[in-house]
Amino acid sequence: MAPKQPNTGLFVGLNKGHIVTKKELAPRPSDRKGKTSKRTHFVRNLIREVAGFXPYEKRITELLKVGKDKRALKVRQEKVGHSQESKEEERGDVQCSPPDEGWWWY
């Protein structure tokens, strides 16, 4: 859908209507929902660094390194369930090494 054009001040036409300047509103507190604060982000990263990954997460990263994406998703679904999108994003941050140059099936 195309963005709405500003009103022209005319009585007829697609952009009819009185010309007004849009009012700048303060951000609502509900706009922050779902965003983590700097402190929370720092604490979570610190805990991750100290504690490491849970055993099922280690298994998933190993499967991803080998290239078994579908199997890794099934393991995650089995252990965590579908509702944990944040875990999926977090796991995406883990770097998987690319296969060696000698592998001919990639």
From Swiss-Prot:
Keyword Ribonucleoprotein: yes
GO biological process, one term: translation
Stretches with biased composition (Basic and acidic residues): 75-93
Superkingdom to which the source organism belongs: Eukaryota
PROSITE patterns named in the record: RIBOSOMAL_L36E
Keyword tags: Ribonucleoprotein, Ribosomal protein
Region (Disordered), start-end ranges: 75-106
One GO MF term: structural constituent of ribosome
A GO term from the CC aspect: ribosome
Keyword set includes Transferase: no
InterPro entries assigned to the protein according to its UniProt record, in alphabetical order: Ribosomal_eL36, Ribosomal_eL36_sf
Sequence similarity: Belongs to the eukaryotic ribosomal protein eL36 family.
PANTHER family: 60S RIBOSOMAL PROTEIN L36
Name of the molecule in the record: Large ribosomal subunit protein eL36
Species annotation: Daucus carota (Wild carrot)
Gene: RPL36
